[in-house]
Amino acid sequence: MQAAWLLGALVVPQLLGFGHGARGAEREWEGGWGGAQEEEREREALMLKHLQEALGLPAGRGDENPAGTVEGKEDWEMEEDQGEEEEEEATPTPSSGPSPSPTPEDIVTYILGRLAGLDAGLHQLHVRLHALDTRVVELTQGLRQLRNAAGDTRDAVQALQEAQGRAEREHGRLEGCLKGLRLGHKCFLLSRDFEAQAAAQARCTARGGSLAQPADRQQMEALTRYLRAALAPYNWPVWLGVHDRRAEGLYLFENGQRVSFFAWHRSPRPELGAQPSASPHPLSPDQPNGGTLENCVAQASDDGSWWDHDCQRRLYYVCEFPF
């Protein structure tokens, strides 16, 4: 019995060292060769069996899986999985508690970011403002050019109007001398339009003349013959350029000169031997008789006598043009 234990003490360490070497060789074999894995496991199991029989050891003692069998490997993997599960359980999961308050650095960073955004927006506004300023300058220059062009156009229109006025006056003067009465350095032309005295003067002026202003009795007699021939057999009063609007009884021509002679109408004188009438003839009173109500002078077309009338009365008129 002592010999058996002695043999076991000598053989078992060698077998165990062989088993560990076999397992190391197995690992090398699995890593490098992998061809005789099953054969090595069978040899190892057989040697352990013989050793147990020689020593009289029970089948359950010793290394339960000395050769690293598949069952031992599975147990080792299970233990590894359990260890990983324990590590996962031991790993603390992040809590869902309230987030920590921002630090001063975070606040400063946020403020700087907002300021950067505001600065970028302000830069865009400056760019747009510059574009608007450029547009305003362009529009101002265009408006100035338009004003200059409008001024030039206005000057051109005024020049055309002046030229048209001169042409109309020249046309009226030529028409007056061609169609009317030429007398010395004057031409008289009768107009059969009914106008007030001021309107008649304006129309004569627009045609380059004025209302008739007979300078002496010779011109007065020539004008009388012209009006009688133009309006016969009727008797029409015709406006002359004579009035006393400035002062009652002070008769002036339209050019401001004082009238040097008069041809006022006088009522018929009674025949010799007849009783003189105390009152003037009601249809032909002596002129002027209107006072301040009648300040303009018209000439009768039949005899050339002068009558004072209300200046607003609408009558024929005769224009005078220089020749």
UniProtKB/Swiss-Prot annotation:
GO cellular component: cytoplasm; extracellular region; extracellular space
Residues of the C-type lectin domain: 183-320
KW Glycoprotein (keyword) present: yes
Name of the protein: C-type lectin domain family 11 member A
Entry function: Promotes osteogenesis by stimulating the differentiation of mesenchymal progenitors into mature osteoblasts. Important for repair and maintenance of adult bone.
Motif Cell attachment site location, chain numbering: 61-63
Any single biological process term in GO: positive regulation of cell population proliferation
Disulfides per UniProt: C204-C319, C296-C311
Gene: CLEC11A
Any GO molecular function: carbohydrate binding
Tissue: Expressed in skeletal tissues including bone marrow, chondrocytes, primary ossification center-associated cells, the perichondrium and periosteum. Lower levels of expression were detected in spleen, thymus, appendix and fetal liver.
This protein's UniProt keywords: Cytoplasm, Disulfide bond, Glycoprotein, Growth factor, Lectin, Osteogenesis, Secreted, Signal
Signal peptide: 1-21
Residue numbers spanned by region Disordered: 55-106, 272-295
Chain intervals with Acidic residues compositional bias: 74-90
Organism: Homo sapiens (Human)
Subcellular location: Cytoplasm; Secreted
